[in-house]
Each structure stands twice: as structure tokens, then as C-alpha cells.
């Protein structure tokens, strides 16, 4: 299992350039499969999830040229070669499920996707995806092996209301609807900035898509697609991650390309606990300004709320903030398990199955530990940790950097490769001492 040794008592200083958004890039690659036209994507992050998606597209028939130095991908899929996704792709992440929507136009007699993998943060049901596709006219068969979708008579526009504004379901239904006949209206849709980026991409390809402020997306199906050149938005999760690392280490980092308009809920909560930042034309500078004050309720939500991927690194900040703070995770029912690692380091965290908030969430009646109370500030001690998922991984690295002496062993670091371009190199250039397993003996 890949691992690193992270030394504590580290103050991070310098600048870092945020990469293109993981959650936009992978979906845009899938969207390129909608037609046989050429697509050029710029600002492409060199991360494992993108590499896996590129490999998946190639297996399906795409011709891909990736200039990693220039961060540019050119992709062209003259025809779809496979109707069944190889199982090795579904065990890594959840991207393959979007092929049900994206490929039904080109593979009307069926596309099969095996049971999915991804982060261990809860089941993340596909019910919203599948029911929405059925309303568009798709025939769905579910087995122990996976999901089979077909539309031998083609897809037809429909009115769809999602029970919950699921990001994945919204993306899947957009991809299916652009190839359907007539008009589709998706109500209670997710409108994260990555989804808006997908919509902009599809508009460039000739699609007629509009959105409004009440979470409604209107799509007119089209059979003619244009070639597209598109620059991917910066990754708001990576930007916030390095911002939190700056504050918790009592340092100062300028995060180049960070867009404050994509991060307003995060910046608001960061300011409320005393974290410092200043917005510039080409990025955001984050810095330690004064002792952090807790006593906040951190409640995750869909856009325009505080997104769930910011929650785990923010817990490290709360462990160093004076007072009692509450986390209420409303997006994924099993995303607080990583707190065991912080407790092992000395943090005071208590898990609860109840909704510790003025409002109840969809997990209020289940037996899910989705709320937590964190007391701070608490000195953290170096220890051995195993990363359970991508964002928890960055939280563990942040925590290890501020331990009082010693060094922490952190294993399963390939999780970080999924979502952070050159994360180790960036941290080292900011002053961190991060050693791979094969070089540790030099420093022991």
C-alpha cells in the first residue's frame, strides 16, 4: 500500500497554482462521447480519476491525445466500439454510470455498466439516475452484476422532478436529454459550478440549455453536435484545501487561479472562525490572522451551500479552534468515519446519529452517524493513519503537518492521487517535509 511520512511542526508558505476541476474534467470527457466530433479540453488536471476516464474513453473507441505538460486533451470518438463497460473501470470511481445517459443516443440497443466503486462515504443510491432515465424512455434492467440501459425507440423529452438535487443524477439526465427528441425539464436539479461548466460545454457544442434560480434546467434535444474547445474551471476543492492548510499551519499561501465566486460559502465560514484571506484578480491569498474561534455549526449542503468535499479538511481547522463546534453532514450518510483518525491523533470528536441542527435532514430517521461535535483547540500527536477516502486523505495530511514533533505514517495515499495534481510536490514547495516510503530510511 503506497504510503508517506509527514513531519509535524510545519508552517506552509508560498504560492500554489490550483489545477482544473476534477469533478468537471471527468464529466466533460464523458460528454465528448456524445458525438463523433472533435473536442479540445484545456486546463486538464493530471490526476488518477482523469487518467482512468481517459483510459475508459479509449476502450470505448475514443482517440485521445493528452499533452500533460500543456494540460490539453484532444479527444475524438468516430464510433463506439463496446456496449459493455469493462469491470475494472467501475471498481475505481463512479464515472461509468454517466455512460448510461451519454451513450444511449449512439448505442440505443443497450449499454451495460457494472456495479460501481468510489469513495467509502456511503451507498449513494442510483435510484434517481435510473428513474429519470426511465422517464426519458430508457428501459432499465438491474442485476447483481450491474445496470443495463437501452432505448430502441429513442429517448423523448420529459418533465422530471428529482427527489433530491443529486449532482450525478443531474449530470446523467443532462447527457441523456441532449440526445432526446423534444424538450426536457429537470426540476430540483443540482446547479454546482461543475454542472454549469458542463452546460457551457454543451452549449458550445450546439445544445440549447437554460437554467434558472429555482433549480430548473430546460434542455432541447439536438442531433447535430459541433466541435468544441473548452477551458476547464479551476478546482474549488483543491483551492479550499490549500487555503485551509495555510490557516491551520499558521502560514500564508497564495492560491493562484482560485475563484472566490465559486467558494463563497467556504470563505464565509472560514472568516467566521477567524481564518484570513484576501481576494485578488488572479487568485486568493490565505493566511493565519489570529487564534481561531470555534462555536460554529458547519452544515453541508448542495449548491449554493457548504459542499461536502470541504467538510473533512475543515474538521482539522475546527480541532484547532477554541470552543465547541458542530458538523452536520447532510449529503453523504457515512462521511464522518475519518474522524476516528483525528481522534487517534488527539482531537476531541464525538459522533452522533441525530441531526445536530435546527433542521432535520434526510438521514434523521436512519441509523447513520452523520453529526459530530468537535472541541478545540487540541494539540495533535503524530501517529499511523490509513486514508479511507480522497478528502479525508488531505485532512489527515493537514493534521500531520501540525503535530507537535515527530512524524506520521499515512498509508493508502493513492487516494490523494485521484483528486490532487502533484499534491506531494506542491506541499514540499510550500515547506512541508513529505517522504515516500522508499526514501524514509535516509531520515529515520
From Swiss-Prot:
Its EC number is 2.5.1.7. Pathway: Cell wall biogenesis; peptidoglycan biosynthesis. It catalyses: phosphoenolpyruvate + UDP-N-acetyl-alpha-D-glucosamine = UDP-N-acetyl-3-O-(1-carboxyvinyl)-alpha-D-glucosamine + phosphate. Its main location: cytoplasm. The active site is at residue 119. One of its GO terms (molecular function) is UDP-N-acetylglucosamine 1-carboxyvinyltransferase activity. Cell wall formation. Adds enolpyruvyl to UDP-N-acetylglucosamine. This is UDP-N-acetylglucosamine 1-carboxyvinyltransferase. It comes from Chlamydia trachomatis serovar A (strain ATCC VR-571B / DSM 19440 / HAR-13). The gene is murA.
